[in-house]
Structures are given as structure tokens and as C-alpha cells.
Amino acid sequence: MKFRAKITGKGCLELFIHVSGTVARLAKVCVLRVRPDSLCFGPAGSGGLHEARLWCEVRQGAFQQFRMEGVSEDLDEIHLELTAEHLSRAARSAAGASSLKLQLTHKRRPSLTVAVELVSSLGRARSVVHDLPVRVLPRRVWRDCLPPSLRASDASIRLPRWRTLRSIVERMANVGSHVLVEANLSGRMTLSIETEVVSIQSYFKNLGNPPQSAVGVPENRDLESMVQVRVDNRKLLQFLEGQQIHPTTALCNIWDNTLLQLVLVQEDVSLQYFIPAL
């Protein structure tokens, strides 16, 4: 097994710093899935979708160099388990750097070596090297690391402005622990919370629905009908506060009374966060 990658350019370096920071804020331990065309972050363990979980893919276009050899020709992948904060801390040291290199090494034990090339104000180059301990996962547990295979959602809608959404959810989190998220195929979305003493509702309209949201919809379905899911407010707020990328596309997908999925896309990065219904 071999893996080596290099990131250069301010934009790509900042993107990787933000991605690793997002993963660290949402998971203590993660699985790094190295594929021929991408680097994927997933949750450790086999919890399924019974708890909030994050998957993130960084495609090959974000790297100047990307080379890997998997465990075999038929199984051309590598799965590494590591502490997410260790990778985030190493990536943060690349702020203002000229490059960041990732390499699978074996220094007494398997490690993910992160080498950062820095240039001082006097033009002198220096390297900072982080050796992060990893556990190479056996093939028998790979299936637990895959993102879920799901049918088309019952509703898919574009998210409102991030700061507005985060502010609303933060206020609701101070009132109660559960939030009801509703959306339809006509661009409307509602967030609501209700306790014995207070009821709060926030309405959004004209958000827009992605084109694929209409695929497979029965002809007789009322596009104004709302699909809903009640989720843990703290988990939703954790994602809204924790994610650090600047998405060009932000979607909310709902499986009625079953699952909430938030999808963010920025250039060569896609991020999915799943929150199960209560």
C-alpha cells in the first residue's frame, strides 16, 4: 500500500484546512478512505444512521499530486483510522505555507506523515513534519465506512443564508432540544419548536428546489405538501457552527419522519451530514 499527495496554492491549502477542521469539530475519530480519484472522510465504527454522521469527499482536483496503490488491483483502496483533531492541527500549521504533503509511512508503526513547507519573511524555507498515528483497517470492516445507499429523498430544497439559518437554530436550541424541519417541492421551508410555554416558527419561501428533486415524483403529488422530520437541535446546531467551508451549493434533503441530510458542495469538495429522526 502506498499513498502520497501534495497540495499547493493558497485556495487549495485553505480548503483542506477548512475541511479537516470541519471533520474534527464533528467527529473525534474518523476514517480516511484513500481511493484512486479522491480522499474521503467518514465516521469510525458501525453506528449506521442511528446517530448523526458525517461523510466528506475531497476529489483529486484539489491536489497538485495524488498517487496511491491500494491493497490489491481489485481492491484499490486504503482505509486509515485516525484522530480527527490530530489531522486538523497538522493542517492548520499550513496556514501561509507554500505546500502540504500527505504520505502513508511506517515509523515504528503506521503513520500519516504531514509535511508542511513554510517560507519566512526573509525567504528562507523550512519544513514542519507531523507524524500522525493511524490504524490500517482490515478489509472485513470496509463496508462500515461506506456512505449510506438511500432512495431519493421525499423533499430536496436549497438552504437559506447560512448565517440566518444558524442564528435561528441557535435561538431555538436555547428554548428546546428538538426542532421540526419541514420543506416542500415549491421552495418553502419551515423550522419550528414547541414547548409547554412557548412556540416558535420560522418560515422561508422561494428558496428553490434542485432540478433532480422532481425526478421520480408522482404526477398526482401536491407540490405544496410539506415533508417533515424532527431532529436533535444540538446536532443540527453542531453542524451549522462546525462546518468551515464556503459552499457554492447547500441543500437540505428530507426523508419523511426518518432522516435529515445536509449537503454542501464547494469546488472539489462535497460534504454530507445525516441526522436521524427522533
UniProtKB/Swiss-Prot annotation:
<protein>
    <recommendedName>
        <fullName>Checkpoint protein HUS1B</fullName>
    </recommendedName>
</protein>
<dbReference type="GO" id="GO:0033314">
    <property type="term" value="P:mitotic DNA replication checkpoint signaling"/>
</dbReference>
<dbReference type="GO" id="GO:0030896">
    <property type="term" value="C:checkpoint clamp complex"/>
</dbReference>
<dbReference type="GO" id="GO:0031573">
    <property type="term" value="P:mitotic intra-S DNA damage checkpoint signaling"/>
</dbReference>
<dbReference type="GO" id="GO:0000724">
    <property type="term" value="P:double-strand break repair via homologous recombination"/>
</dbReference>
<dbReference type="GO" id="GO:0005730">
    <property type="term" value="C:nucleolus"/>
</dbReference>
<dbReference type="GO" id="GO:0000723">
    <property type="term" value="P:telomere maintenance"/>
</dbReference>
<dbReference type="GO" id="GO:0006289">
    <property type="term" value="P:nucleotide-excision repair"/>
</dbReference>
<dbReference type="GO" id="GO:0044778">
    <property type="term" value="P:meiotic DNA integrity checkpoint signaling"/>
</dbReference>
<comment type="subunit">
    <text>Interacts with RAD1 and RAD9B.</text>
</comment>
<dbReference type="InterPro" id="IPR007150">
    <property type="entry name" value="Hus1/Mec3"/>
</dbReference>
<comment type="similarity">
    <text>Belongs to the HUS1 family.</text>
</comment>
<dbReference type="Pfam" id="PF04005">
    <property type="entry name" value="Hus1"/>
</dbReference>
<dbReference type="InterPro" id="IPR016580">
    <property type="entry name" value="Cell_cycle_HUS1"/>
</dbReference>
<dbReference type="GO" id="GO:0035861">
    <property type="term" value="C:site of double-strand break"/>
</dbReference>
